[in-house]
């Protein structure tokens, strides 16, 4: 395949890797199953096994984070008011788009460690960051309405947190997004593509807007 718009090119395997955010072995296995081809996977190298395991663990902890953000939203009247009153979201939209809330106190790290997840995994998923000042760990998302970012197959690859406060004396960034991880690379994922692709294909129209709430 060749895309004359962005100059991307390759074969069927590299196309699936790009389209579905898969590693090479995952793409080969996917195509074999799709085409009913008998496929005997070669033994993965230690590096490939480690990469696959790391990706699966990040997907897993992202799902845990989603459940935490969703439950936190249900417990936060300010977040609900912001989403439904100020932004005008319907409850159906909030559920379909997996919108949540990250509490101001930043308690996700504690929540995750109580469930047995290690700090290194939280760092790998960019759900926790390390302070450049003193090396301490802190939640990446705090006091923000959370938008879930999924890949083309529906896997949760990251999050985008939108500041809710109208006044911003600390000059905090309006958005904080998941940085580069083993499953999420900047520029490779479009928010709401997974939720919109089928409908857009049916009506042959897709509207592109600037911000997640739009």
Map each language-model feature to its residues.
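Non-catalytic accessory segments of DNA primases and related replication-initiation nucleases
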Residues: 1-124
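Phosphate-handling DNA/RNA-contact segment within nucleic-acid enzymes
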Residues: 47-65, 105-214
